[in-house]
Amino acid sequence: ARLILEIIEECRKNVSEDFPIILRISGSERIEGGNSLEEMLYLAPKFEAAGVNMLEVSGGVQYEDMQDIIPSHSKKIGRNVYEASEIKKVVNIPVFVVGKINDIRYAADIVERGLVDGVSLGRPLLADPDLANKFKEGREDDIRPCISCHFGCLARIFQVDMKTMSSKDISCALNPRCGMENHYNITKADVLKKVAVVGGG
């Protein structure tokens, strides 16, 4: 922990007092010999004292199952909420949680109940970039949900284009415009019709 504390202290020395320093941590690495929740409960106040303004709690570690860091459909919703809620009890700075928060009602509930101060969203915003606006407007049923399938987002990161030796462009199994926004501009039809979509295949 000494290295990260020194980094935080140096960052704080070199930025203004109102410049936010946000630290992302694993609430638990969930492997033998890895950082445990107990260790994070000990370290979190030290991070705060060193100058961190907000903690973002993830989980897992890359040496094991990648799907523990970026939970798939087989993992429960709110994979890291318990760890984040416990860490929140020992600090006086905002604590956000990340990791399969793919239901906006669930996200609102854990904030309203005071388990966390906020949620960080990634994949749900690929599925529906207007998610937050739709929720604010009371249009939850119009939200295109992330199903945590990994087919367009995480899987594409690890698919290498052999010509350029770079990751393939990001996409989303539920949002055909994701990563192709400049190519798939949706315009209003000249003639409006009522249509039915049969099947999802």
Regions found by a protein language model. Name each.
Residues 1-200:
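Flavin-dependent oxidoreductase catalytic cores
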